[in-house]
Every structure is written in structure tokens, then in C-alpha cells.
Amino acid sequence: MATPTRAIVYWEGDSRDVLKTWPRDVQRDFGLSLRKLQDGERPTLDARPMQSVGQGVFELKAEDEAAWYRVIYLRIEDTIYVLDSFTKKTRKTEKNDLNRARARLSNLKLRLQKEKIDAKRKSDK
């Protein structure tokens, strides 16, 4: 039986840099959840759909005494795209965080569409 391939993780914008500023244990928790997602398993952290950002977009959630930590991601086939990472201090997600994730999703879709067109042109030659 073939071993399933692990999904690749792509970090959009500064999402990885932001996560790297978080406390080590929080980074580890998100790393473990992303690894589970890569392997096609359920994440260890709480996750919920983020329809307000886009179809198929999810939010991983963790917290400590200092803040609430969020990673917004989308899985397309064998790739996980981390659209945004941010912290928040209130229950409400800030509009600028949602808008940034939406903009990155829009840019991602355009980029993937362009890559598909370029690949088709290349194969037609």
C-alpha cells in the first residue's frame, strides 16, 4: 500500500513571520495542528469554518493568558495555504484582519489561475 503524500504548506504574506513571534508553546501547538492537516488528519487545535473570508477557509484557534492566536488557512488539493496569522484581545475579529485574509485569498486565486493558464500554454507548445 502506498504511503499518502504529505500536503505542502505555503505561507502567504507575513503569516509565518507573525507566527514566529508567538510564545514557543503556542507555535508548537499550531505546528502540530498544521502537521496533522498535512497528513489529512483533524487538527489538534480547535478549528472552525471562516465563511466570512471565503469558501473552504478555516481558522485554527489557541489562547493563553496574554492573547488569542489565530491562523487562517485554506486547503486546495495537496496544498495548505496559510492566509494569515494574527493575535486578538477581544472576542471579535478585527475588520482589518478579515480584510487582509480576504485580500490574500483573492491574490492566491488569481495566482493559481495564472499558473494554470501558463501550464496549459506550456503543454500546448
Question: What do the PLM-derived regions correspond to, one by one?
Answer:
Residues 1-68, 76-80, 87-125:
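Basic, Lys/Arg-enriched alpha-helical interface segments
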